[in-house]
Protein backbone atom coordinates (compact mmCIF):
# COMPACT_ATOMS: atom_id res chain seq x y z
CA UNK A 1 0.00 0.00 0.00
CA UNK A 2 1.45 3.32 -1.12
CA UNK A 3 0.11 6.53 0.48
CA UNK A 4 0.82 10.20 -0.28
CA UNK A 5 -0.18 13.54 1.22
CA UNK A 6 -0.44 16.26 -1.40
CA UNK A 7 -2.87 17.93 -3.80
CA UNK A 8 -4.94 15.29 -5.61
CA UNK A 9 -4.32 16.61 -9.13
CA UNK A 10 -0.60 17.08 -8.49
CA UNK A 11 -0.38 13.54 -7.14
CA UNK A 12 -2.23 12.01 -10.08
CA UNK A 13 0.14 13.82 -12.44
CA UNK A 14 3.03 11.79 -10.97
CA UNK A 15 1.40 8.47 -11.91
CA UNK A 16 2.19 6.87 -15.24
CA UNK A 17 -0.34 7.10 -18.04
CA UNK A 18 -2.55 4.01 -18.41
CA UNK A 19 -1.20 2.46 -15.20
CA UNK A 20 -4.34 2.19 -13.03
CA UNK A 21 -6.94 -0.60 -13.25
CA UNK A 22 -9.71 1.06 -11.20
CA UNK A 23 -10.22 4.44 -9.55
CA UNK A 24 -12.79 5.01 -6.78
CA UNK A 25 -13.03 8.31 -4.93
CA UNK A 26 -15.21 10.61 -2.83
CA UNK A 27 -13.92 14.17 -3.29
CA UNK A 28 -14.94 16.89 -0.81
CA UNK A 29 -17.16 18.51 -3.44
CA UNK A 30 -18.22 22.14 -3.32
CA UNK A 31 -21.88 21.65 -2.37
CA UNK A 32 -20.76 20.14 0.96
CA UNK A 33 -19.85 23.69 1.98
CA UNK A 34 -23.48 24.71 1.64
CA UNK A 35 -24.63 21.78 3.76
CA UNK A 36 -22.17 22.38 6.56
CA UNK A 37 -22.99 26.10 6.69
CA UNK A 38 -26.68 25.43 7.33
CA UNK A 39 -26.22 22.20 9.27
CA UNK A 40 -28.39 19.93 7.11
CA UNK A 41 -26.21 16.89 6.74
CA UNK A 42 -25.18 14.18 9.17
CA UNK A 43 -22.12 13.63 6.97
CA UNK A 44 -20.59 16.66 8.68
CA UNK A 45 -22.02 15.57 12.02
CA UNK A 46 -21.40 18.26 14.62
CA UNK A 47 -20.48 21.69 13.28
CA UNK A 48 -18.71 23.62 10.60
CA UNK A 49 -15.56 23.77 12.71
CA UNK A 50 -15.57 20.01 13.30
CA UNK A 51 -15.77 19.27 9.58
CA UNK A 52 -13.14 21.86 8.68
CA UNK A 53 -10.58 19.95 10.72
CA UNK A 54 -10.98 16.95 8.38
CA UNK A 55 -10.87 18.40 4.87
CA UNK A 56 -10.90 21.49 2.65
CA UNK A 57 -13.44 21.74 -0.14
CA UNK A 58 -12.30 20.78 -3.65
CA UNK A 59 -13.78 23.54 -5.87
CA UNK A 60 -15.93 22.87 -8.92
CA UNK A 61 -13.52 24.97 -10.98
CA UNK A 62 -10.87 22.24 -10.65
CA UNK A 63 -12.93 19.23 -11.70
CA UNK A 64 -11.91 19.37 -15.36
CA UNK A 65 -8.20 19.11 -14.51
CA UNK A 66 -8.96 16.36 -11.99
CA UNK A 67 -11.03 14.30 -14.42
CA UNK A 68 -8.47 14.82 -17.19
CA UNK A 69 -5.77 13.33 -14.96
CA UNK A 70 -8.01 10.46 -13.87
CA UNK A 71 -8.72 9.61 -17.51
CA UNK A 72 -4.99 9.76 -18.33
CA UNK A 73 -3.85 7.41 -15.55
CA UNK A 74 -6.58 4.80 -16.07
CA UNK A 75 -5.87 1.91 -18.40
CA UNK A 76 -8.05 1.45 -21.44
CA UNK A 77 -11.04 -0.76 -20.65
CA UNK A 78 -11.39 0.31 -17.02
CA UNK A 79 -13.98 1.77 -14.64
CA UNK A 80 -14.18 4.89 -12.49
CA UNK A 81 -16.58 5.50 -9.58
CA UNK A 82 -17.20 8.88 -7.94
CA UNK A 83 -19.37 9.50 -4.87
CA UNK A 84 -21.37 12.74 -4.88
CA UNK A 85 -24.73 14.40 -4.32
CA UNK A 86 -27.35 15.28 -6.95
CA UNK A 87 -26.12 18.84 -7.44
CA UNK A 88 -22.55 17.71 -8.09
CA UNK A 89 -23.67 14.87 -10.38
CA UNK A 90 -25.23 17.32 -12.84
CA UNK A 91 -22.03 19.38 -12.81
CA UNK A 92 -19.53 16.52 -13.19
CA UNK A 93 -21.23 14.34 -15.81
CA UNK A 94 -20.71 16.64 -18.85
CA UNK A 95 -17.11 17.38 -17.84
CA UNK A 96 -16.29 13.68 -17.53
CA UNK A 97 -17.82 13.03 -20.95
CA UNK A 98 -15.84 15.93 -22.39
CA UNK A 99 -12.51 14.43 -21.29
CA UNK A 100 -13.43 11.03 -22.78
CA UNK A 101 -15.40 8.97 -20.26
CA UNK A 102 -18.60 7.10 -21.06
CA UNK A 103 -21.20 7.69 -18.36
CA UNK A 104 -23.24 4.58 -17.66
CA UNK A 105 -25.52 5.56 -14.79
CA UNK A 106 -25.70 6.78 -11.21
CA UNK A 107 -25.66 3.88 -8.76
CA UNK A 108 -27.68 4.55 -5.62
CA UNK A 109 -26.19 3.94 -2.20
CA UNK A 110 -29.17 3.45 0.15
CA UNK A 111 -27.88 4.42 3.60
CA UNK A 112 -30.91 2.86 5.37
CA UNK A 113 -31.02 5.74 7.89
CA UNK A 114 -32.61 9.05 6.93
CA UNK A 115 -30.44 12.17 6.91
CA UNK A 116 -31.08 15.65 8.26
CA UNK A 117 -32.82 18.32 6.19
CA UNK A 118 -36.20 19.82 5.38
CA UNK A 119 -37.50 18.73 1.95
CA UNK A 120 -37.86 14.94 1.50
CA UNK A 121 -34.91 14.13 3.71
CA UNK A 122 -32.22 12.11 1.93
CA UNK A 123 -31.27 8.55 2.79
CA UNK A 124 -29.17 7.95 -0.31
CA UNK A 125 -26.05 9.11 -2.13
CA UNK A 126 -25.01 8.82 -5.77
CA UNK A 127 -22.07 6.79 -7.08
CA UNK A 128 -21.38 7.90 -10.64
CA UNK A 129 -20.28 4.98 -12.82
CA UNK A 130 -17.95 5.86 -15.70
CA UNK A 131 -16.02 3.75 -18.19
CA UNK A 132 -12.87 4.27 -20.25
CA UNK A 133 -12.97 1.95 -23.24
CA UNK A 134 -15.07 -1.13 -22.59
CA UNK A 135 -14.90 -3.44 -19.57
CA UNK A 136 -17.49 -5.99 -18.49
CA UNK A 137 -18.65 -6.01 -14.88
CA UNK A 138 -17.71 -9.20 -13.05
CA UNK A 139 -21.28 -9.84 -11.83
CA UNK A 140 -24.03 -8.71 -14.19
CA UNK A 141 -26.79 -9.52 -11.68
CA UNK A 142 -25.77 -6.81 -9.18
CA UNK A 143 -28.55 -4.19 -8.84
CA UNK A 144 -28.06 -0.43 -9.17
CA UNK A 145 -29.29 0.19 -5.62
CA UNK A 146 -26.74 -0.91 -3.01
CA UNK A 147 -28.13 -0.99 0.54
CA UNK A 148 -25.55 -0.61 3.30
CA UNK A 149 -26.16 1.21 6.57
CA UNK A 150 -24.24 4.43 7.02
CA UNK A 151 -21.30 4.18 9.44
CA UNK A 152 -19.57 6.76 11.58
CA UNK A 153 -16.35 5.93 13.41
CA UNK A 154 -14.90 9.41 13.70
CA UNK A 155 -14.54 10.55 10.08
CA UNK A 156 -17.50 12.63 8.78
CA UNK A 157 -17.81 11.18 5.25
CA UNK A 158 -16.91 7.55 5.96
CA UNK A 159 -18.22 4.88 3.58
CA UNK A 160 -18.96 1.26 4.58
CA UNK A 161 -16.15 -1.10 3.59
CA UNK A 162 -18.73 -3.67 2.43
CA UNK A 163 -20.09 -1.13 -0.05
CA UNK A 164 -16.64 -0.40 -1.45
CA UNK A 165 -15.92 -4.12 -1.72
CA UNK A 166 -18.86 -4.45 -4.13
CA UNK A 167 -17.35 -1.82 -6.45
CA UNK A 168 -13.85 -3.28 -6.21
CA UNK A 169 -15.13 -6.81 -6.89
CA UNK A 170 -17.26 -5.67 -9.81
CA UNK A 171 -14.56 -3.74 -11.65
CA UNK A 172 -11.19 -5.35 -10.89
CA UNK A 173 -9.38 -8.62 -10.31
CA UNK A 174 -6.86 -9.77 -7.71
CA UNK A 175 -3.45 -8.17 -8.16
CA UNK A 176 -4.75 -5.16 -10.09
CA UNK A 177 -4.07 -1.58 -8.99
CA UNK A 178 -6.80 0.45 -7.26
CA UNK A 179 -6.29 4.19 -6.73
CA UNK A 180 -8.09 6.79 -4.58
CA UNK A 181 -6.81 10.42 -4.76
CA UNK A 182 -9.09 11.55 -1.87
CA UNK A 183 -8.97 8.53 0.43
CA UNK A 184 -10.53 10.25 3.46
CA UNK A 185 -11.47 7.61 6.04
CA UNK A 186 -9.59 4.96 4.05
CA UNK A 187 -12.52 2.64 3.33
CA UNK A 188 -11.56 2.22 -0.34
CA UNK A 189 -8.00 1.33 0.65
CA UNK A 190 -9.21 -1.23 3.18
CA UNK A 191 -11.70 -2.78 0.75
CA UNK A 192 -9.07 -3.10 -1.99
CA UNK A 193 -6.54 -4.54 0.44
CA UNK A 194 -9.08 -7.03 1.82
CA UNK A 195 -9.66 -8.28 -1.73
CA UNK A 196 -5.92 -8.62 -2.47
CA UNK A 197 -5.63 -5.70 -4.86
CA UNK A 198 -2.65 -3.37 -5.04
CA UNK A 199 -3.43 0.05 -3.58
CA UNK A 200 -2.23 3.62 -4.00
CA UNK A 201 -3.94 6.42 -2.10
CA UNK A 202 -3.60 10.13 -1.52
CA UNK A 203 -5.20 12.71 0.74
CA UNK A 204 -3.92 16.22 1.39
CA UNK A 205 -5.47 16.28 4.87
CA UNK A 206 -3.18 15.43 7.83
CA UNK A 207 -6.30 14.44 9.80
CA UNK A 208 -7.22 11.83 7.18
CA UNK A 209 -3.76 10.26 7.44
CA UNK A 210 -3.90 10.23 11.24
CA UNK A 211 -7.37 8.68 11.17
CA UNK A 212 -6.37 5.97 8.70
CA UNK A 213 -3.20 5.17 10.62
CA UNK A 214 -5.27 4.58 13.76
CA UNK A 215 -7.76 2.54 11.75
CA UNK A 216 -4.97 0.31 10.45
CA UNK A 217 -3.66 -0.27 13.97
CA UNK A 218 -7.07 -1.02 15.45
CA UNK A 219 -7.83 -3.57 12.73
CA UNK A 220 -4.29 -5.05 12.64
CA UNK A 221 -4.42 -4.87 8.84
CA UNK A 222 -2.29 -7.27 6.85
CA UNK A 223 -1.07 -5.22 3.90
CA UNK A 224 -1.04 -7.02 0.55
CA UNK A 225 1.71 -5.85 -1.80
Question: Model-predicted segments: where are they?
Answer:
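Core catalytic lobe of class I
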Residues: 1-210
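Short, conserved SAM-binding/catalytic segment
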Residues: 213-225
Amino acid sequence: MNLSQTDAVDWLSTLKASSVDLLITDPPYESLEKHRKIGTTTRLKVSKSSSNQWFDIFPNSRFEELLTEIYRVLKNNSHFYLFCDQETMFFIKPIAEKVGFKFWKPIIWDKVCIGMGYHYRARHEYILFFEKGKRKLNNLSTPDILTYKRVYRGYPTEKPVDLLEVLVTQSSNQGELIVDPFFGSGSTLIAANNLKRKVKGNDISPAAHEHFEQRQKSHSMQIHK
